């Protein structure tokens, strides 16, 4: 595992050195270049801005539903599991703002720090936080660092929540865990907890190498603007151009399940008929059921009408 991390870091350093804005925020041109499939609205810096309405509907999506859509589209490595959590009974949804940290190296750290301070910035751990927008999720690769790793405690956590209204996905250790738990709405996924903090005196162990660059979270490559879906102890990162498809597919699955369960309770169909590919007669019955109940179902009426328009039976 350590060898794999080392190789990944070497490749990432080589990649970042050849990108504009190395060490800090990705350029707008590079962000546009790396997200060509997104044709919708963007933030001023070029980051894809998936609509709030899609984010609202995403809160009902399960990992299974998202995984199936992404796998069918060729995105097989978008799911990361086995996290420590804060407010584990809630769902985290938002647009990814990414930060990449690497093990500290004085010459590179000092060059980055000098440039940042010339722009009026302070500690590197606050630079990504300053860029957060409402409904963002701060997604940080802290390379799993535990002892001496935390760049987020209750002060930074409160700043993150004040700007985004969301929590974090943080591949590393956090500190001040009780203070973070006290932030209502700070739904978060992180690797571990430790009472220490990063870059203690005489121990430059971490540095910020990129903001909104492609970053690695476990086995996932995460891009700025991805939709973050965190629930049930795991996180799925959904490319922005697939977010609406994930939501619509999830809604159709839920409606079909509701219809199937209803008809089974009524004794209209057998389990064998519902558990296999539906016959044209059942599909027609489903469409009629949608039309009859569209004002009562837990899916927006407008979405049900759109589903009905697209059906051919």
Which sequence ranges carry the predicted segments?
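Bacterial N-terminal signal peptides
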Residues: 8-18
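Amphipathic alpha-helical packing elements
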Residues: 26, 31-59, 66
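Basic, amphipathic alpha-helical segments enriched in Lys/Arg and hydrophobic/aromatic residues
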Residues: 46, 272, 286
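Positively charged n-region of N-terminal signal peptides that target proteins for export
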Residues: 1-5
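Buried hydrophobic positions in well-ordered alpha/beta secondary-structure cores of metabolic enzymes
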Residues: 46, 160, 226-228
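Feature captures the catalytic cores and cofactor-binding loops of soluble hydro-lyases/lyases
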Residues: 57-65, 69-224, 237-283, 291-313
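Boundary at the C-terminal end of the N-terminal hydrophobic targeting segment
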Residues: 21-23
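Short acidic-glycine loop/turn motifs at beta-strand connectors
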Residues: 231-232
């Amino acid at each position: 595992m350590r060898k794999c991390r080392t190789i990944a870091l070497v490749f990432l350093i080589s990649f970042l050195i050849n990108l504009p804005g190395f060490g800090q925020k990705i350029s707008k041109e590079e962000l546009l270049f790396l997200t060509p499939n997104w044709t919708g609205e963007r933030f001023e810096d070029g980051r894809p801005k998936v609509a709030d309405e899609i984010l609202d509907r995403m809160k009902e999506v399960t990992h299974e539903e998202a995984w199936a859509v992404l796998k069918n589209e060729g995105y097989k490595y978008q799911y990361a599991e086995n996290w420590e959590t804060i407010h584990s009974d809630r769902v985290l949804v938002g647009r990814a703002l990414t930060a990449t940290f690497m093990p500290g190296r004085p010459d590179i750290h000092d060059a980055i720090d000098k440039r940042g301070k010339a722009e009026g910035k302070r500690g590197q751990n606050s630079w990504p936080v300053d860029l957060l927008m409402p409904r963002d999720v701060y997604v940080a690769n802290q390379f799993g660092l535990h002892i001496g790793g935390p760049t987020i405690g209750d002060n930074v956590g409160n700043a993150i929540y004040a700007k985004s209204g969301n929590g974090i996905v943080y591949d590393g250790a956090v500190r001040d865990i009780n203070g973070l738990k006290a932030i209502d709405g700070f739904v978060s996924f992180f690797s571990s907890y430790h009472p220490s903090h990063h870059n203690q005196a005489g121990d430059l162990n971490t540095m910020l190498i990129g903001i909104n660059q492609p970053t690695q979270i476990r086995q996932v490559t995460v891009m700025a603007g991805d939709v973050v879906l965190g629930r049930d102890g795991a996180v799925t990162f959904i490319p922005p151009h697939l977010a609406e498809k994930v939501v619509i597919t999830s809604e159709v699955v839920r409606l079909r399940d509701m219809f199937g369960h209803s008809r089974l309770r009524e004794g209209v169909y057998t389990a064998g008929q519902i558990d296999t590919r539906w016959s044209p007669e059942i599909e027609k019955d489903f469409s009629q059921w949608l039309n009859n109940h569209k004002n009562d179902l837990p899916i927006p009426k407008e979405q049900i009408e759109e589903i009905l328009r697209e059906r051919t039976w």
